[in-house]
Amino acid sequence: MNDACFSIVAKDCARDELLVRARRKGDIEKVFPKAKVKRNAKADYLYRARIKKDVVVAALKGEVDRITYSNFKSSVTDAKLHAAYLRVWGNLGPLQENWDEWPMFKEF
């Protein structure tokens, strides 16, 4: 997503739920406004919410339907999130075949 970043796993929740985890306050609520988000200072992801699977599916479908951009990185307006995504993009680049042949990517 271009305005929030979180992880979704099937951990520590009921069979009909998923655990949505985020590092930044507010990211979960951007997509799941009714979520009961808890902060856990001892966890690698500070913010967590158990959310029903059908709610997750509907929300993610809504996010897909909302896509209008032709370039993901250019659509991210939050500077801190953009910088994080850019680092991930650069780190994943070498997984692509012939990545090192692209001169513009030599800096990564």
Task: Go through each PLM region and give its residues.
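Structured alpha/beta or helical-core interaction and ligand-binding surfaces enriched in interleaved
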Residues: 1-108
